[in-house]
Amino acid sequence: MGDTETRSPTRPRRPRKSRPKPETLVGYYRQMLLIRRFEERAARAYTEAKIGGYCHLNLGEEATVTGLMAALDPRDYLFTNYREHGYALARGIESRRVMAELYGRSTGVSKGWGGSMHMFDVTHRLLGGYGIVGGQLPLATGAALAIDYRGGDEVVMCTLGDGTVAIGAFHESLNIAALWNLPIVFVIINNGLGMGTTVAKSSAEPDLYQRGAAYRMESARVDGFDPVAVREAAVKAIEAARSGRPYLLEVITERLRGHSVVDPAKYRSAEEVERLKHEDPIQLFGSKLTANGLLDSDSIAAIGEEVAGIVTAAADFAASSPLPEVATLFDYTYATPVPNDSRRLPGQPLFEPLPLPAAAAAEAGVRA
């Protein structure tokens, strides 16, 4: 893994365009820092056994997440994979509800039943959070088809990891989207690694955005360390999708930790780990804003203190929130209520004899 040049493609340069207002840029920095501190607190809670299951973090991808969500209108829909905490925050969901979901509490964004990988919020049009690699692709494409069928003007954004481009659902979804001119933007979050496998070792075409050519789909690559560049590229992609031209966007980024909290990332060389320390997107963006007079040591400290308070409050809220009632386990599985025929609830031994219906019990008594 010492040959990092084969793992991460050169980050593309951003075309010169008018920059956002100063307060917007500072807002991007704050959003990125909130995601960073939130994910760090989540990692800590996981090691303290306050969070169960799997836990995948957006550490290192803060600029990518912030830029993408800054481009997406409130009316538009978002589908993500299991690395979605930062997207939920940047989409506008309260940090305490996101943290409560990680803790599995009833006050969480998915009522405590979704956990880290399955966050869902109709109000903010976040339609998952999917634990299966590529599971969001067909559903996002179907949502775009529904928009087109109803004559709506919304757009679907579907993010996926670089490890997803080799599965069948990727081809099927892009093919259908291109054939039917669906309003959808597919965003490949290329952090260079599918768990521990490099893109160069898993894809015959390492320039992943070039895969759009197979579907005659417009595509582009953008530097995921710059939230402004990401937003500009995403706006262009969304405008194309809204006019009936699906789009494939590849964002080059890095993850600062392993695939999940429990992954020690030993497949990385010491040189690569050291390089990543100097390519921290928050430090890079903060330095730019400081050089342009938009931030100074006092404002950076103030933002840091504010964000720390938000994250601490979120963790306290999650820890003090109640666990969901067992009876609500099936309440949020479907959009409409369905009969629940299950007779075994969580907490019952798997092989505990179930009570027989009255008729069967009576018949059994006769046979005895």
Region annotations inferred by a language model:
Residues H85-G86, R105-V109, V185-V187, A213-R216, ...:
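Short, surface-exposed, polar/charged, turn-prone segments marking secondary-structure boundaries
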Residues A88-A90, G196, H259, T328:
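Short acidic, gly/pro-rich beta-turn/loop elements at beta-sheet edges
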